[in-house]
């Protein structure tokens, strides 16, 4: 793998990890907000955040698969 591709892969991977870590923190806060407020909108936002986290995980797995394919 050339250096540019490797750097891009590592940067993308690090970015996904950062998004997931910050997302986990935000998710915990939103769980508290939804629980305390019992407002339907808070649960809607929480649900959207959970889906976004799952999507980022999928993208991370896709990135790893693409990296593996490039390195064949």
Region annotations inferred by a language model:
Residues 24-71:
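Amphipathic alpha-helical protein-protein interaction segments
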């Amino acid at each position: 793998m050339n250096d540019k591709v490797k750097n891009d892969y590592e940067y993308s991977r690090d970015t996904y990890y950062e998004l997931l870590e910050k997302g986990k923190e935000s998710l915990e806060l939103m769980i508290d907000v939804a629980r305390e407020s019992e407002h339907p909108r808070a649960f809607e936002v929480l649900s959207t955040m959970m889906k976004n986290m799952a999507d980022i995980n999928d993208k991370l797995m896709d990135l790893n698969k693409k990296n593996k394919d490039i390195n064949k």
